Amino acid sequence: NYLLELNKLFDLGFSAVQGVRDAKNLDTLYAALDGARDIYYHFYDGKLLYHVGSSATLAGSGMAFTTQLYKECLGHLDITGAGFDKILQKEIVSRGYRIAFANEAIVFDEKTSKSDQLVNQRARWINTWFKYFSFGFGLIGKGIFQFNWNKFLFGLILLRPPLFIFLLIGLFCMLLNLILNPFLALIWFLGFVIFIIGFILALAINNTDARIYKSLWGIPTFIFYQVLSLLKVRNANKHSVATKHFHADKKTQ
């Protein structure tokens, strides 16, 4: 079914398609919260972004391309470390292509089960954002001068920091404005309320597993470990991000 769903969009003329990365395991707090994060990003940065006329962001897995486009975008580049998907999506969109989103093309992804693995993975992924977010400026510029909505909107998305950094900046601004300007603090608070509603909406629309809803109480802990990841960003590429499987350990305990 996965390949059939991808082919529906290739048959429509698209050369790049992003599918849905669904959680294979939801047996720990971290795995369930990682699954919630994927649902949020697939809904807003995938489905919604594609349907408003831009491109779905690449998730690093569950994606497909024509061989010709892949070679055209990466064949002349020497890429080391994490972040090839960041480079690839920039090359695709800058060439005038759109990345389609296949909501029914589902690939199952093993989720992070332990905190140390979460820290190492997030450190490397945060590192790639700092390394490649500047791509957004170029795409915004091209979008403005070429009157290209796809490039302009996609460029804006590339400039947005990882979700936990975005939330922490918002919290800092709200607390600061409690002292400087209470009215602006209220605006920031309303922004948080809208975000929470939007987050729950993304989960509700996707018929989310009950275990993910039950895990939401652990969001502060999840954010804490991502802050720890931020402290390891400089040496992030030295750490492996391959998800280790611990199911066998549980069976022997």
Annotate the PLM regions.
Residues E5-T80:
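Long helical/loop segments within the catalytic core of UDP-sugar-dependent glycosyltransferases
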Residues I157-N237:
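Membrane-embedded multi-pass helical conduit in multi-pass membrane proteins
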Residues T80, E110-N127, R211-K214:
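Nucleotide-sugar-dependent glycosyltransferase catalytic core
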Residues I39-Y44, V119-I140, F222-N235:
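Catalytic core of nucleotide-sugar-dependent glycosyltransferases
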Residues V119-C173:
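Active-site-adjacent helix/loop segment of glycosyltransferases
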Residues A82-L88:
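Acidic donor-binding loop at a coil-to-helix junction in glycosyltransferase catalytic cores
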